[in-house]
Amino acid sequence: MQSLFAPDTVVKGEDRDGDGDPDVIEIRLEVMELNGKSPDGPAVVPEYEIGPGITPGFWVFAPKTRGMTTVNFESLVANRIIRLPSPVIRIEQGDEVRIILENSHYLPHTIHFHGLDHPFKTPDGDGNDGVPLFSEHPVMPGAARTYRVQPRHAGTMFYHCHVQPHAHILMGLQGMLVVEENRPNNWVQTFNIGAGRVRSPSVAVLEGYAREYDLHYLEIDTELNNRIQRFNDPRLVSRAIHRGYNITQREPDYFVLNGRSFPYTLRESMVVVRPGQKNLIRVLNGGAEGLALHFHGHKPTVTHRDGVAVALGARVQRDVFWIASAQRIDLELNTTNDGLNAYGEGAWLLHDHREQAVTSNGIGPGGDISMVIYENFLGPRGLPQTVGGVQSLAPYFSPAYYAGEMPVFIGMGGHDLLDPDRPRSGGSKTWLFWSGVCLLALLVLIWPARWRRAR
């Protein structure tokens, strides 16, 4: 499988301290649009679904790509590295890192390294804080800027655009940035595309944890995001975003974890564990509102806040964590079944306990629902086992459900139970119709992803 990276997307240079890993790193990012207005028709391009049939507009930072932004010539679907959220970036404490923003977008942007140790100016006198007017001019369309960091402190940080931040951050120009503790032979995983499970944890993480997960939360107000679907003219887009949108009247419609809403979170962002393990979970609230993160069946412990270790005597263990906008917390999830850390194996929900956050445009279940799930509770193709079998998940993979066109209890054995529009006769025909819809959704769910995306 090709990486889709350009040859210079990540360049790892010399090992200056002789400890077996590179210490000079160069990373290139672009700015991409998702679900923007097509000049050729009503479709949005490149297409990126947060849920079944749900395609708000986004701007994202993406690794510098090669080839097409879509899956193939015949498809409108975005390729796998251009997506929400902007990629998690990992670097090592003490490394000399150059992050180059190549502005491939039609509006000016910057990168601000929120919480990351960095100088206000580079040695050459260039602005390095990403804040227009005070630090530097923004990076104009077609231009590039090199940001330089050499972090002295490890932790979970945040990067985002600082041009008109009330709009650009919430459009998706934000990502998690992790500084790993320095260790010998520590080849960190530079990008975690789509966040979720870290495939190659650092040496320091593996000293204390079996697995590591990145969780990036964001809420979406389509009154902002979908403005880019109205125009192709950058002047009109800029006016609509920067002058037409009033953030003081913000009302989110959708809530995403790692760029997806339920049920797509079940395919990408479950926290999969085994009994008796310690797992590291890094959480970023990238939204404009607070997040009440609730774990069913477990009580994790906060070990770090905003990249700073919490003293052992001050660490808090609970099942709901209030996380402010832009805040990061590191959690230790201990799956020892002792009635405190964990209650035993299962498929335990993980979600924001603000009730609107478990809906998609007011329809539930949706939003940022995910799971802490034990491997023994995984069913076919890595989805959770359910009381009704995998087919009971099928309705939620249908756009018709989130358009409000399917009965509320259809996935729960109730079919059209309590549906006021249900005919008092001919019930078998109604049941047969919705069964057919669910069967079609199930086939789409289990069919190979490549077939689904090639159009």
What kind of region is each of these model predictions?
Residues 29, 99, 111, 161, ...:
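Divalent metal-coordination and catalytic microenvironments
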Residues 18-24, 90-94, 140-142, 152, ...:
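Extracellular/periplasmic catalytic domains that process cell-envelope and extracellular macromolecules
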Residues 105-109, 116-120, 127-194, 315-414:
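Extracellular/periplasmic metallocenter environments
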Residues 101-105, 283-287, 337-338:
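Asparagine-centered strand-capping/turn motif at beta-strand->loop junctions
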Residues 1-109, 117-119, 124-127, 134-136, ...:
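N-terminal, post-signal-peptide metal-ligating segments of extracellular/periplasmic oxidoreductases
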Residues 205-301, 323, 329-333:
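Surface-exposed interaction/gating patches
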Residues 440-441:
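A cross-kingdom feature that marks long, compositionally biased intrinsically disordered regions
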Residues 287-289, 294-315, 349-356, 369-374:
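Active/binding-pocket-proximal capping segment
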